[in-house]
């Protein structure tokens, strides 16, 4: 059973395949640089996926898990800084769509 109480599922749409690849690499660098900040703020886990079942879509999925609502709020502050750094560093235009939820139950099949 995970310690996560809240999750965010964020999709990021890109205009070109190159933008998506560069965006993935640069975002990972920024996230790694901020690893300790996110951990201290209460982030539990991050998973990044490339969406493959939407024809013509250049989309990444970001699943974030948080230990509680306070952790979510604190991590949002770090995200704002990270998004600004990403924009300034890459100039890539991306559309971001966020979905958030409270964990009702969690099943681990391993």
Residue ranges with predicted function:
Residues 15-29, 64, 73, 107:
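Charged, low-complexity, helix/coiled-coil-prone segments
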Residues 31, 43, 66, 75-78, ...:
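Extended interaction regions within the primary functional domain
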Residues 18-46, 81-90:
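Short amphipathic alpha-helical segments
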Residues 6-14, 47-80:
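Short, well-ordered beta-strand segments in beta-rich or mixed alpha/beta enzyme
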Residues 10-15, 69, 101-110:
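Short flexible/disordered coil segments
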